[in-house]
């Protein structure tokens, strides 16, 4: 996130000094060291294209712009010793205020911006992990990919990452910089949420799969009974309208959901208000 609002905040933004991209991918390779796609054997972790990386960082607050670049794998991000960090932005931009966390679940294609306070950790290491052992069943990366043990994915159980905790990147903490950010802001931006009482209607969206019922974990997956097609417009809406989308997952595995070019606000999950 870089815009006029972000530029007024006291945040780390010196690229490569206190502001770092972290692109996370799990990959499989063939005998020629070429990527293998459409496989559950994605047991090699790459961070910014590097295996087992070490990132030199200053002993102050740093900013990590994290992207889950994996095809299927969900990461349950945290640091050793449950070191606290703060989420300040998501796919939708800056949050209204930092959120203190020890875990952050990140789905494929999802982004998050994090602040990590490394003050007082000079000459120490801090490792970022994915705590896969804590993922509930029904999420790709958990011990069991389907809810209630339904379905299977060829080669999934043999993957050494599934249901396990594993290191993503090591932060090697060095000297503080001359113009260090040393405090976490209490507020970020003012977010005006749309009024659901002024919506033009409710749109029903059902995620399902073809064949084998809910036990089919490999797809093809459907939205309202249809597979994706570049030649078809599934929905149309008036510019500037506010709609309520009611999304139901009728498969045995979790699916990330986002909309390109638009933002949305979650009102409730499973009838629990958010």
Predicted regions and their residues:
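Short, surface-exposed ligand- or partner-binding patches at beta-edge/loop junctions that are enriched
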Residues: 119-135
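A generic structural signal for residues embedded in beta-strands
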Residues: 64, 114, 128, 245-247, ...
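Short, hydrophobic/aromatic beta-strand segments
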Residues: 73-80, 127-128, 254-259
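Histidine-centered copper-binding motifs that mark active-site loops
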Residues: 1-115, 134-136, 145-214
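Active-site pocket scaffolds in enzymes
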Residues: 86-102, 148-150, 163, 198-274
């Amino acid at each position: 996130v870089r815009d006029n609002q972000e530029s007024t905040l006291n945040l780390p933004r010196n690229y490569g000094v206190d502001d770092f991209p972290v692109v996370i991918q799990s990959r499989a390779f063939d005998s020629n060291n070429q990527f293998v796609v459409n496989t559950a054997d994605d047991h090699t972790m790459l961070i910014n294209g590097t295996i087992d990386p070490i990132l030199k960082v200053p002993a102050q607050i740093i900013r990590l712009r994290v992207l889950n670049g994996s095809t299927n794998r969900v990461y349950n991000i945290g640091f050793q010793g449950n070191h606290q960090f703060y989420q300040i932005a998501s796919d939708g931009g800056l949050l209204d205020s930092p959120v203190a966390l020890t875990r952050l679940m990140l789905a494929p294609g999802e982004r998050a911006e994090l602040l990590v306070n490394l003050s007082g950790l000079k000459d120490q290491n801090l490792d970022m992990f994915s705590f896969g052992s804590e993922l509930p069943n029904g999420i790709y990366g958990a011990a069991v990919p389907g809810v209630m043990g339904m379905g299977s994915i060829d080669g999934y159980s043999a993957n050494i990452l599934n249901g396990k905790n594993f290191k993503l990147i090591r932060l090697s903490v060095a000297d503080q910089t001359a113009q260090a950010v040393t405090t976490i802001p209490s507020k970020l931006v003012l977010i005006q949420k749309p009024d659901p009482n002024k919506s033009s209607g409710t749109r029903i969206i059902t995620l399902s799969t073809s064949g084998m019922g809910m036990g089919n974990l490999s797809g093809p997956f459907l939205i309202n009974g249809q597979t994706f097609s570049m030649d078809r417009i599934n929905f149309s809406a008036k510019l500037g309208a506010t709609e309520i989308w009611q999304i139901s997952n009728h498969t045995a595995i979790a699916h990330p959901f986002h909309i390109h070019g638009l933002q949305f606000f979650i009102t409730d999950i499973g009838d629990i208000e958010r």
